Amino acid sequence: MDLKHSRSVKLNDGNLMPVLGFGTFASKEIPKSKAAEATKVAIDVGFRHIDAAYFYQNEEEVGQALRDKMADGTVKREDLFYTTKIWITFLRPELVRQCLERSLKKLGLDYVDLCIIHIPIAMKPGEELLPKDANGKFIFDTVDIRDTWEALEKCKDAGLSKSIGVSNFNHKQLELILNKPRLKYKPTCNQVECHPYLNQSKLLEFCKSKDIVLVAYSALGSHRDSSWVSSDSPYLLEDPVLMTIAKKHNQTPGQVALRYQLQRGVVVLAKSFNEKRIKENFQVFDFELTPEDMKTIDSLNRNFRYSQMAFALDHPDYPFLEEY
């Protein structure tokens, strides 16, 4: 599945997903109003796939932006592809729908296009996003992710989400779901960190073999939020190899990093709250990387993960100890 000439990809449930998405995560110091402004700019420049989550705590602002853009005639609801995610404190099957309904209420929407399990590591239910005990230790929960999946299938049947999928799953966790008895719907996608320093080639191959779309987050490297990312992480967009290829094509290194994913058959998310860069990030359909460029970018892989999710390292379901 080469997304070179295509603006959307058909998921295994028949629904279409735009191959280029706009990410709405913002670190704490960025005012929430920025998410609304940036989402409007993104829709104005052509983005139709909006990636959000309960955890991001800005769905009211993003939802307002969507409704404003529908009200002014820029888009209709059916033109948009909106993703939300079930947070890790809602993975008990009886809580899944509640999390999705909270998102829908904040958004002011009747349904989302895609709802995915954010991370396959359950934490203690409650209002705290990352619950800790009195000693500052994270409080884990024990949930069979297959039960969570069944609850998500019911949300699809209820019309709350058109498609369902997962995020941050390794291939063994995907197999758990694919091989479960009475599986009603396969995951349509697995959204993972993916960029030239962590190109996920084995996981991509596995997902393609199962007709699951790989969706790339942190495709431009990563935000520098110190609670998630180490301050000495390399700056992907300053990589001399990417800069050379970008110069050759008269593009930015960011555009090359996004184009690279599309040509591998990966749906790619681009996050920026800067108007100029939001525009640039959408301009990836009018140039093509050569097979040599692709090989060269492949060779940058060093299995470097910006977001280790270190808070969950001791969790029995921590996904990143597997090779893929």
UniProtKB/Swiss-Prot annotation:
What does its activity-regulation comment describe? The dehydrogenase activity is inhibited by 3',3'',5',5''-tetraiodophenolphthalein, phenolphthalein, genistein, quercetin, zearalenone and diethylstilbestrol.
Report the active site residues: 56 (proton donor)
Q: Which UniProt keywords apply?
A: Cytoplasm, NADP, Oxidoreductase
Activity's dependence on pH: Optimum pH is 10.5 for the dehydrogenase activity. Optimum pH is 6 for the reductase activity.
Residues binding NADP(+), per UniProt: 24-26, 51, 167-168, 191, 217-225, 269-281
| Expression across tissues | Expressed in lung, specifically in bronchiolar club cells, type II alveolar cells and epithelial cells of the duct of the bronchial gland (at protein level). Expressed in gastric parietal cells and in epithelial cells of the large intestine and colon (at protein level). Expressed in brown adipocytes (at protein level). Expressed in vascular endothelial cells (at protein level).
Catalyzed reactions: (2E,6E)-farnesol + NADP(+) = (2E,6E)-farnesal + NADPH + H(+)
Q: Which GO terms describe its molecular function?
A: aldo-keto reductase (NADPH) activity; aldose reductase (NADPH) activity; farnesol dehydrogenase activity; ketosteroid monooxygenase activity; steroid dehydrogenase activity
Q: What is its EC number?
A: 1.1.1.-, 1.1.1.216
UniProt: substrate binding residues: 118
Q: Where in the cell is it found?
A: Cytoplasm
Feature type site, description Lowers pKa of active site Tyr = 85
* Primary localisation category: cytoplasm
List GO BP terms, alphabetically: prostaglandin biosynthetic process; steroid metabolic process
Per the record, its GO cellular-component terms are: cytoplasm; cytosol
Q: Which family does it belong to?
A: Belongs to the aldo/keto reductase family.
Q: Which PANTHER family match?
A: ALDO/KETO REDUCTASE
Assembly and partners are described as: Monomer.
- What is the protein named? Aldo-keto reductase family 1 member C15
Q: Which organism is it from?
A: Rattus norvegicus (Rat)
